[in-house]
């Protein structure tokens, strides 16, 4: 082709051009095709470098249905074998005694008082001699955790041994609880925890005096504490990890001590005296002996000075049967009122105080409940206190983020939630708060008189 022809084609108009000019849409389509081509090549190159990218890993395992009996049995057996293997990996009593002997043999002088110490070099020597089961405890991380202010860079042998004992106990307990985890997903339902505690009762000497007819009420009393505090969303299940992390299991297993003091038993919710006290109160309130509590019967709880407005809210919000409360619902009520400083208890009471269901308390809510306190004061021949004064005191105590609203988190953060709720629901509690200075003065006078005698 000569240069004349080339020039003619170059100068040709669109209508006479042998190649049509591409439209904007065609250019976009071509660009997308090129992008897809090059992106696919690049992505394909990545796939070739790592076989893992070719498949999506499985992250969901369906639980066997009720009619899939064989699959259920297979799952149960495999879990049982797995838990048995984990149990065999733990230190037994003989191995723990051997560990103590090795630690005592390799202690590093000088002693601090009567406390034996060990340095890092001897610590590693014991780890080598103690066997493979102990390997996880003899790490630099564990040593550093227990290292405090010793000038020789040593740790306490007793503290380390207690650490090992605690770890072994936690693993043993986790395995024990997992045996009752029917679903095998790391949590216990209410019925699972009931079975665990029921089978635990014979191993607790402090519960030997309980009659078997009371076992069901005891189990209900014990289980409610776990679920009230560890299941705030009321899902009906608790993580095994949460059970191990809280102190409730320690309190329950404390009942293994045959010489547990009377004071410890009185303050332990799981003790026989405590369970009998709570159930006895329930029976005393149940005047018509129908096994349930009406609003009138519940009004006699404690000092019998709770307001009718608050009790109305209890029966509106809590689960009742024909307008009456059963023992399980009563336990939640008792746990909330006896532990008002705890977030779970404050959440329970806050829900009752939040009459508009807005997630916060405003002046209207406070006035609604305090009016009932003022009415009770009149009935008892006392001069009613001004609501404005009480309202200002409450907001000063709580110091909410919003100056016109008090949220549940505000109550928890203020550490005054127990005082605020008591002022609003219980005349005796309000009177105690109002006369707190006089009561403190009387206590001081009484203590002075005792000192003089």
Swiss-Prot record:
GO molecular function: metal ion binding
Residues annotated as binding Ca(2+): 286, 288, 290, 292, 297
Subcellular location: Nucleus; Cytoplasm
Subunit and partners: Interacts with MCM3AP/GANP, PPP5C, and the phosphatase 2A core enzyme composed of the PPP2CA catalytic subunit and the constant regulatory subunit PPP2R1A. Finds in a complex with ABCB1, TFPI2 and PPP2R3C; leading to the dephosphorylation of ABCB1.
Annotated source species: Bos taurus (Bovine)
GO biological process: B cell homeostasis; cortical cytoskeleton organization; microtubule cytoskeleton organization; positive regulation of B cell differentiation; regulation of dephosphorylation; T cell homeostasis
Annotated Gene3D superfamilies: 1.10.238.220, EF-hand
SUPFAM superfamilies: EF-hand (SSF47473)
Any one GO cellular component localisation term in the record: centrosome
Protein name, per record: Serine/threonine-protein phosphatase 2A regulatory subunit B'' subunit gamma
Known role: May regulate MCM3AP phosphorylation through phosphatase recruitment. May act as a negative regulator of ABCB1 expression and function through the dephosphorylation of ABCB1 by TFPI2/PPP2R3C complex. May play a role in the activation-induced cell death of B-cells.
Keywords of the record: Calcium, Cytoplasm, Metal-binding, Nucleus, Repeat
InterPro entries: EF-hand-dom_pair, EF-hand_13, EF_Hand_1_Ca_BS, PPP2R3C
CDD domains listed in its UniProt record: PPP2R3C
Stretches assigned to the EF-hand domain: 273-308, 341-376
Major site of localization recorded for this protein: nucleus
One matching Pfam family: EF-hand_13
């Amino acid at each position: 082709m000569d240069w004349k022809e080339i020039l003619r084609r170059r100068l040709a108009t669109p209508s006479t051009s042998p190649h049509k000019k591409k439209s904007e849409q065609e250019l976009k389509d071509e660009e997308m095709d090129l992008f897809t081509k090059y992106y696919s090549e690049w992505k394909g190159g990545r796939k070739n470098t790592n076989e893992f990218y070719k498949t999506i890993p499985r992250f969901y395992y369906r639980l066997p249905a009720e009619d899939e009996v064989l699959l259920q049995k297979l799952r149960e057996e495999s879990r049982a074998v797995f838990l048995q293997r984990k149990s065999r990996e733990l230190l037994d009593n003989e191995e723990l005694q051997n560990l103590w002997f090795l630690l005592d043999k390799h202690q590093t002088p000088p002693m601090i008082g009567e406390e034996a110490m060990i340095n890092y070099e001897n610590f590693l020597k014991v780890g080598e001699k103690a066997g493979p089961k102990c390997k996880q405890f003899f790490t630099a991380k564990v040593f550093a955790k227990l290292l405090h202010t010793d000038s020789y860079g040593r740790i306490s042998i007793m503290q380390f041994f207690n650490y090992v004992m605690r770890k072994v106990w936690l693993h043993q307990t986790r395995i024990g609880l997992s045996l009752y985890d029917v679903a095998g997903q790391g949590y216990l339902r209410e019925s699972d925890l009931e079975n665990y505690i029921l089978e635990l009762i014979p191993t607790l000497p402090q519960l030997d005096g309980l009659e078997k007819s009371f076992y069901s009420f005891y189990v209900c009393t014990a289980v409610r504490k776990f679920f009230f505090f560890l299941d705030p969303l009321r899902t009906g299940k608790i993580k095994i990890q949460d059970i191990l992390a809280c102190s409730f299991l320690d309190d329950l297993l404390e009942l293994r001590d045959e010489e547990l003091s009377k004071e410890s038993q009185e303050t332990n919710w799981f003790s026989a005296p405590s369970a009998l006290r709570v159930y006895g109160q329930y029976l005393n309130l149940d005047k018509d002996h129908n096994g349930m509590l009406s609003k009138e019967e519940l009004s006699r709880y404690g000092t019998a000075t709770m307001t009718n407005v608050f009790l109305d809210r209890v029966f509106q919000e809590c689960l009742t049967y024909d307008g009456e409360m059963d023992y399980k619902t009563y336990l939640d009520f008792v746990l909330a009122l006896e532990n008002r400083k705890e977030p779970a208890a404050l959440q329970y009471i806050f829900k009752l105080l939040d009459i508009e269901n807005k997630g916060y308390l405003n002046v209207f809510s406070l006035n609604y409940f305090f009016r009932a306190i003022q009415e009770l004061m009149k009935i008892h021949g006392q001069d009613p206190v001004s609501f404005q004064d009480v309202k200002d005191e409450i907001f000063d105590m709580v110091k909410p983020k919003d100056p016109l609203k008090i949220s549940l988190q505000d109550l928890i953060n203020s550490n005054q939630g127990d005082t605020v709720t008591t002022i609003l629901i219980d005349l005796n509690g309000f009177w105690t708060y109002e006369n707190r200075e006089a009561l403190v003065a009387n206590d001081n006078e009484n203590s002075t008189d005792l000192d003089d005698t």
